[in-house]
């Protein structure tokens, strides 16, 4: 599975939301993510990809779409 596929799968498991067709849509505006969901997602991403997501790196505008989350995870994997 690619990073993108794993993240889409995580959204399905955590939030019962298929985000595969809304990869550029703001997930907060779409009602997929909220503050609690963000915490759940960070924990899942850290476990899934064996990375550490610093809270200072997880700004809403930087991680508000699936595509931005994929890029953020890839950057942290390469750090």
From Swiss-Prot:
<dbReference type="InterPro" id="IPR036736">
    <property type="entry name" value="ACP-like_sf"/>
</dbReference>
<dbReference type="GO" id="GO:0070395">
    <property type="term" value="P:lipoteichoic acid biosynthetic process"/>
</dbReference>
<dbReference type="GO" id="GO:0071555">
    <property type="term" value="P:cell wall organization"/>
</dbReference>
<feature type="domain" description="Carrier">
    <location>
        <begin position="1"/>
        <end position="77"/>
    </location>
</feature>
<dbReference type="InterPro" id="IPR003230">
    <property type="entry name" value="DltC"/>
</dbReference>
<comment type="function">
    <text>Carrier protein involved in the D-alanylation of lipoteichoic acid (LTA). The loading of thioester-linked D-alanine onto DltC is catalyzed by D-alanine--D-alanyl carrier protein ligase DltA. The DltC-carried D-alanyl group is further transferred to cell membrane phosphatidylglycerol (PG) by forming an ester bond, probably catalyzed by DltD. D-alanylation of LTA plays an important role in modulating the properties of the cell wall in Gram-positive bacteria, influencing the net charge of the cell wall.</text>
</comment>
<dbReference type="Pfam" id="PF00550">
    <property type="entry name" value="PP-binding"/>
</dbReference>
<protein>
    <recommendedName>
        <fullName>D-alanyl carrier protein</fullName>
    </recommendedName>
</protein>
<keyword id="KW-0963">Cytoplasm</keyword>
<dbReference type="GO" id="GO:0036370">
    <property type="term" value="F:D-alanyl carrier activity"/>
</dbReference>
<keyword id="KW-0596">Phosphopantetheine</keyword>
<comment type="similarity">
    <text>Belongs to the DltC family.</text>
</comment>
<feature type="modified residue" description="O-(pantetheine 4'-phosphoryl)serine">
    <location>
        <position position="35"/>
    </location>
</feature>
<dbReference type="GO" id="GO:0005737">
    <property type="term" value="C:cytoplasm"/>
</dbReference>
<comment type="pathway">
    <text>Cell wall biogenesis; lipoteichoic acid biosynthesis.</text>
</comment>
<keyword id="KW-0597">Phosphoprotein</keyword>
<dbReference type="InterPro" id="IPR009081">
    <property type="entry name" value="PP-bd_ACP"/>
</dbReference>
<keyword id="KW-0961">Cell wall biogenesis/degradation</keyword>
């Amino acid at each position: 599975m690619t990073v993108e596929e794993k993240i889409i799968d995580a959204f399905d498991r955590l939030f019962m939301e298929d985000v595969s067709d809304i990869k550029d849509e703001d997930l907060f505006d779409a009602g997929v993510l909220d503050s609690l969901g963000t915490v759940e997602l960070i924990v899942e991403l850290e476990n899934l990809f064996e990375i550490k997501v610093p809270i200072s790196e997880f700004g809403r505008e930087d991680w508000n779409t699936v595509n931005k989350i994929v890029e953020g995870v890839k950057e942290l994997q390469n750090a």
